[in-house]
Amino acid sequence: MRAKPASPKSDPEDPGLRTFTLAGHLLAAPKAAPGLYLVATPIGNLGDITLRALETLAGVDIIACEDTRITRRLTERFSITGLLKPYHEHNAALARPKILERLAQGASIALVSDAGTPLISDRGFKLV
């Protein structure tokens, strides 16, 4: 039996609950508090991601990512359907003010790179 896909929208019965799947099981992820979350992603094997990273990605309002195609593979594998926004060296100057504005409005945003931890050899350092 396959787990039902996750939804980035709040459950009408519990507005603070979001979900993701792991090994075919549907798991709960609380809605993330407002703020910027730096989330490390696996280098090579998607199965190496941490439970905390999955909870964070499922719980945030926006996932700012280096390459949406790469991050989409990760989010689809774990049934995380959230709003992916590109944030990389070619659009950082334009995207950064928008992200900062959303943060000021109370959004929760995860910053991820294609592999590894944001800020290590990428443009994330200017946002943080």
Predicted segments, located by residue:
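Short glycine-cluster motifs
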Residues: 104-128
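Glycine-rich, flexible N-terminal cofactor/catalytic loop recognition
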Residues: 8-90
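Catalytic-core regions built around general acid/base machinery
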Residues: 53-59, 102, 126-128
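Conserved helicase ATPase core of P-loop NTP-dependent helicases/translocases
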Residues: 94-100
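Short helix-loop hinge/linker segments at domain boundaries
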Residues: 75, 101-104
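N-terminal acidic, proline/glycine-rich, low-complexity intrinsically disordered segments
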Residues: 1-8
